[in-house]
Amino acid sequence: MATTKSFLILFFMILATTSSTCAKLEEMVTVLSIDGGGIKGIIPAIILEFLEGQLQEVDNNKDARLADYFDVIGGTSTGGLLTAMITTPNENNRPFAAAKDIVPFYFEHGPHIFNYSGSIIGPMYDGKYLLQVLQEKLGETRVHQALTEVAISSFDIKTNKPVIFTKSNLAKSPELDAKMYDICYSTAAAPIYFPPHYFITHTSNGDIYEFNLVDGGVATVGDPALLSLSVATRLAQEDPAFSSIKSLDYKQMLLLSLGTGTNSEFDKTYTAQEAAKWGPLRWMLAIQQMTNAASSYMTDYYISTVFQARHSQNNYLRVQENALTGTTTEMDDASEANMELLVQVGETLLKKPVSKDSPETYEEALKRFAKLLSDRKKLRASKASY
């Protein structure tokens, strides 16, 4: 109930800031949002690989990267990991990972990350390998070094408040300039599955600032699209690049939201008689699955409604598989067979229609998005050269 209430408040706050002004393409704020979902992150990884390939083709540039085209990239849990991979710079100040590198990352490291710890009193996985590989891949990079604005969520169990890591917050809250590997582990530290993460940074006065963090899904319930939009709203109002924008209109937003799949067109259904026999652990696992599916649907519903109300429905694309079955519904099944199935889910999803009322496939819609992103980037570069 509290989460739904928070969504509604944010939804109406965003709606209240809109106007009827039509923005020029170069003034549009581009937003990429990636859901949480553990090993199911393979599904949005397939979508990202396709989109980045389209951008490279449209711009005839094999070095084009997603971070070159999006003003804000937000993610929760495994989506936060993907966000870091495509925005963290390498030694040449380019993203250390191309989109095509993400699926191989899951295949190489997934089985070690989701390797049952054998503990009956602690979390299912000890998290040591996950933290180790994040340290190796992301190094000492901090939030301020991200190649575009990021929005990665976590939840502090000591202060009982969400923590949002963004570049634009650093001037007011320098303690949020944490190392990317600490942030990535924290946003992925799902209760039951991984231990919470403790680390420190420093305030502007040099005082120690403590974090006690768990999965960002506790704060955003799996789908960070509303969070990403709120960060984009602030960016549009504060960044000089958008100085002509007086108030936010959804005609000025281009939002791509990627899901990790649900089984809400239910493969798994339960009866009251069946659930009455469950113990606490079974309920916790079921509630997490149900909440993620329901919140994903409601967030999509809220955002779709506001875009349609502003006659900007073509500016929002939600890419989601709503009929996962069998092992593909599990966030921690990192067997090679299941990961291959998840790849197939992502590839098949590209061929599916965006909606029952539209013949346009996700593949076609992403090509349209790629063209818009490319044109906008060129227009902005041209404007900046004058």
Swiss-Prot record:
Disulfide bonds: none annotated. A motif (GXGXXG) lies at residues 36-41. A motif (GXSXG) lies at residues 75-79. The active site is at S77 (nucleophile), D215 (proton acceptor). Probable lipolytic acyl hydrolase (LAH), an activity which is thought to be involved in the response of tubers to pathogens. The nitrogen atoms of the two glycine residues in the GGXR motif define the oxyanion hole, and stabilize the oxyanion that forms during the nucleophilic attack by the catalytic serine during substrate cleavage. This is Patatin-14. It comes from Solanum tuberosum. The lineage of its organism: Eukaryota, Viridiplantae, Streptophyta, Embryophyta, Tracheophyta.
